[in-house]
Swiss-Prot record:
It holds the Pfam family DUF5847. This is Uncharacterized protein R129. Belongs to the mimivirus R160 family. InterPro entries: DUF5847.
Length: 176
């Protein structure tokens, strides 16, 4: 990936991994950051020599249209975020500089997917977009047991003298 700027506003860490898989040279770039409130994010001090992460990615991914290099772009994004209009609405209201870095990359990702036919826009014709995030599944698996545990604890607090209830809830909480 290339840029006339040599600093990227956004992720704290960048790792470049190279290797050969089935005789094909592969390069993987990992942009890593932690979720920080927009007020806590920092930019490079040298703004004349830096570029925002979403602009950097867009510039590099659109450049791939001029060659035969295919980029696989993986993003931490909930599947439910892709197939709902909530983010599209938020992103149409807020400018990139009003978004967290990760949100600005999500906006770039979502603006280049046509949900009606599950295709990538022609702007990124040599890019395959992939999304991954296990939190949707984890919420489904964890929500009911956690809700039950909280309800049980609340019930115990309301009826502290109910010994049968105490024993039953403690057993159920241990089983959960």
């Amino acid at each position: 990936m290339q840029s006339s700027k040599n600093k990227i506003n956004g992720p704290i860490n960048l790792v470049r991994i190279e290797g050969v898989i089935d005789g094909i040279n592969k390069v993987v770039y990992l942009f890593m950051d932690y979720h920080a409130d927009i007020n806590e994010q920092t930019n490079c001090e040298d703004q004349n020599n830096s570029i925002n992460i979403s602009k950097y990615l867009l510039d590099n991914l659109t450049t791939s249209n001029d060659n035969n290099v295919v980029y696989d772009f993986f993003l931490e994004i909930l599947p439910s975020d892709i197939f709902t209009n909530f983010n599209t609405t938020i992103f149409s209201i807020l400018k990139d500089n009003e978004l967290e870095y990760l949100a600005s990359v999500k906006k770039l990702f979502l603006q280049n997917v046509d949900n009606s036919n599950n295709k990538i826009t022609s702007k990124l014709k040599n890019v395959r977009l992939h999304y991954i995030d296990i939190r949707d599944k984890m919420y489904l698996l964890m929500y009911d047991p956690i809700r039950f545990a909280i309800s049980s604890i609340n019930q115990l607090q309301k009826n502290p003298d109910d010994k049968l209830l105490d024993i039953m809830h403690i057993k159920l909480l241990v089983d959960v």
